[in-house]
Every structure is written in structure tokens, then in C-alpha cells.
């Protein structure tokens, strides 16, 4: 029973996170990341989203791309 509560809380948090992504490009990026996570057979969570975003940030080639990923990471902690 407790695990269902945690899962629902996590799902709600992820839904709120997506709602905060106001730019279409942010939503596209989040969609790509979610697809990657699910295709890998992993659970979708803040931790998995953050890990993917940090990986992409590390491999970002330009300042705009870095700002984009930093903004998305920031949404996780609002």
C-alpha cells in the first residue's frame, strides 16, 4: 500500500515537472529523455530524469545548449 502512495506521488511530481516546461523545445527534450529511459527498461523518476539531463549537460557543446539543460534541471528542484 505504501509503495502505491510513493508511486502516485512520484507520478504527480513528474506531471507537475512537465507542466512547468513552458517552451516547446523543453517539452521535446523531456519527451526524448522519457522515451530513452523507458526504452532502456528503467523506471521513470526524478532521479532518472536528472541523471539523463546531467549526462546531456556534460556532453553539451554550446552555451545555449548548456542553458537549456540547466533550466530543465532547475525545474526538478522547484
Curated annotation (Swiss-Prot):
InterPro entries: AriR (IPR024753). One of its GO terms (biological process) is cellular response to acidic pH. Pfam families: YmgB. Induction: Expressed constitutively at low levels, slightly induced upon entry into stationary phase at 37 degrees Celsius. Induced by 5-fluorouracil. Strongly induced at 16 and 23 degrees Celsius. Expression is partially dependent on RpoS, it is repressed by YcgE. At 16 degrees Celsius with blue light irradiation, expression of this operon is absolutely dependent on YcgF for relief from YcgE repression. Part of the ycgZ-ymgA-ariR-ymgC operon. Gene3D superfamilies: 1.20.5.5260. Probably a connector protein for RcsB/C regulation of biofilm formation, providing additional signal input into the two-component signaling pathway. Partially antagonizes the activities of YmgA and AriR, proteins that, via the Rcs phosphorelay, promote the synthesis of colanic acid, an exopolysaccharide and matrix component. This is Probable two-component-system connector protein YcgZ. It comes from Escherichia coli (strain K12). The gene is ycgZ.
Amino acid at each position: 500500500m505504501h509503495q502505491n502512495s510513493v508511486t502516485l506521488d512520484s507520478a504527480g511530481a513528474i506531471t507537475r515537472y512537465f507542466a512547468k516546461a513552458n517552451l516547446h523545445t523543453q517539452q521535446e527534450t523531456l519527451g526524448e529523455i522519457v522515451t530513452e529511459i523507458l526504452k532502456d527498461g528503467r523506471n521513470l523518476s526524478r532521479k532518472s530524469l536528472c541523471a539523463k539531463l546531467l549526462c546531456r549537460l556534460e556532453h553539451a557543446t554550446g552555451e545555449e545548449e548548456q542553458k537549456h539543460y540547466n533550466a530543465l534541471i532547475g525545474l526538478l528542484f522547484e
